Amino acid sequence: MSRIGKKPIDIPSGVEVTVGADVVSVKGPKGTITTPVHPMVSFTVADNAVEVKRSGDSRQERAQHGLHRSLLANCIEGVSKGFSKTLEVVGVGYKVNVQGKNIVLNVGFSHPVNYELPAGIEASAEGNTKLTISGVDKQLVGEVAAQLRRVRPPEPYKGKGIKYIDEQIRRKAGKSGK
């Protein structure tokens, strides 16, 4: 039995879970999100909790059981609290601006890099060096943050680039002079 899958998911007040044939829809104060459901897994909603059941006991069914329980728990947390990732731009002359649904990155290229935010994602800049990405979909928030970091990943010699706020950059020693 999946240890993660057998735990019921508590539904906080203000959150509504609707189970369809092949999709589960979660609606809350921060928005709405839907997640597809594998046919091997079924959901039952009762007493402000959701239970995840699987049809058999094969290896794949056990894996899908825990996966779908975690995905639904992330959906419920996303529509009630939301998710966010904070990026920091490190380097002389490096800065970030948010203009509506666009992020403009000046990170040492000859031109500014424009990144258009997908639907459901919001960004806010704190000063010129910190950028917070937030939304209800945990996977999409992480993907957008990773794509922005990929524009100029931190380099190991001076630590310049775009990094997560809690990321530690492993530094290398420079060349040894004669």
UniProtKB/Swiss-Prot annotation:
Keywords: Ribonucleoprotein, Ribosomal protein, RNA-binding, rRNA-binding. It comes from the Bacteria. The keyword Ribosomal protein applies. GO terms for biological process: cytoplasmic translation. One of its GO terms (cellular component) is cytosolic large ribosomal subunit. The keyword RNA-binding applies. GO terms for molecular function: rRNA binding; structural constituent of ribosome. Part of the 50S ribosomal subunit. Belongs to the universal ribosomal protein uL6 family. This protein binds to the 23S rRNA, and is important in its secondary structure. It is located near the subunit interface in the base of the L7/L12 stalk, and near the tRNA binding site of the peptidyltransferase center. HAMAP family: Ribosomal_uL6_B. This is Large ribosomal subunit protein uL6. It comes from Maridesulfovibrio salexigens (strain ATCC 14822 / DSM 2638 / NCIMB 8403 / VKM B-1763) (Desulfovibrio salexigens).
